[in-house]
From Swiss-Prot:
Homodimer. GO terms for biological process: cobalamin biosynthetic process. It catalyses: adenosylcob(III)inamide phosphate + GTP + H(+) = adenosylcob(III)inamide-GDP + diphosphate. Keywords: Cobalamin biosynthesis, GTP-binding, Nucleotide-binding, Nucleotidyltransferase, Transferase. It comes from the Archaea. GO terms for molecular function: cobinamide phosphate guanylyltransferase activity; GTP binding; nucleotidyltransferase activity. This is Adenosylcobinamide-phosphate guanylyltransferase. InterPro entries: AdoCbi-P_Guanylyltransferase, CHP00454, MobA-like_NTP_Trfase, Nucleotide-diphossugar_trans. The keyword Nucleotide-binding applies. The gene is cobY. Its EC number is 2.7.7.62. Guanylyltransferase that catalyzes the synthesis of adenosylcobinamide-GDP (AdoCbi-GDP) from adenosylcobinamide-phosphate (AdoCbi-P) and GTP. Is involved in adenosylcobalamin biosynthesis. Binds one GTP per dimer. Cannot use other NTPs or GDP. Does not display AdoCbi kinase activity. Is also able to catalyze the condensation of 2-phospho-L-lactate (LP) with GTP in vitro to form PPi and (2S)-lactyl-2-diphospho-5'-guanosine (LPPG), but is much less efficient than CofC, the presumed enzyme catalyzing this reaction in vivo.
Length: 196
């Protein structure tokens, strides 16, 4: 399975900065996503950038230039769904979609998501997508709550437009999404507490 990192947003809630390049404990946010993907069973990593994130594109092309399995995709930057739809043509089978602003993502979590999707797909062939969720009580400050579940910022989707039959996977590990400056402060505390 391949992966797509969404890294073309405007970063509005962070004051209009390129969120993938925000430093957290000395590392760029996007590195917290690329690193575990490289250590996982994912084959190729596509990174969607846009006119909103030109420095992110430069950073990826420089920092990961020796990785032949990392490819930058230029999108319009009109919005998450629009950018995702622009990337669909790069894929011929289901793929992971990962936000560029996640911390605490680990390769074993990625592998378990991939394995779970293929297991579900083998039992129910018409399943096309997987939404990964975290129990609300594990999440420090959820901005979205679906019946006690918080989106983890990582999903599996099929390369087609429109409705996709979706299953849900609930994981116990906290994958933390950085949306605001308060989230960034909280993430720093969590990382220091965990010694990361």
């Amino acid at each position: 399975m391949d992966a797509l990192i969404m890294a073309g947003g405007k970063g509005t809630r962070m004051g209009g900065v390129e969120k993938p390049l925000i430093k957290l404990c000395g590392r760029c946010l996007i590195d917290y996503v690329v690193s575990p993907l490289l250590k996982s069973k994912v084959n190729n990593i596509f990174i969607a950038t846009s006119p909103n994130t030109p420095k992110t594109k430069e950073y990826i092309n420089s920092a990961y230039k020796d990785y032949k399995n990392i490819v930058v995709i230029d999108t319009s930057g009109k919005g998450y769904i629009e950018d995702l739809n622009e990337c669909i043509g790069y894929f011929s089978e289901p793929f992971l979609v990962v936000s560029s602003d996640l911390i605490n993502l680990k390769s074993k979590i990625i592998n378990s998501i991939v394995d779970y999707f293929y297991c579900i797909k083998a039992k129910t062939p018409d399943v096309e997508a997987l939404a990964v969720m975290i129990p609300k009580e594990k999440y420090p400050n959820p901005s979205i709550d679906f019946n006690g579940l918080v989106p983890a910022g990582i999903n599996v989707v099929s390369p087609k437009h429109g409705y996709q039959k979706e299953e849900i996977m609930v994981i116990d590990e906290l994958i933390f999404n950085i949306n605001t400056k308060d989230d960034l402060k909280l993430a720093e505390m969590l990382l220091k507490k965990d010694g990361l």
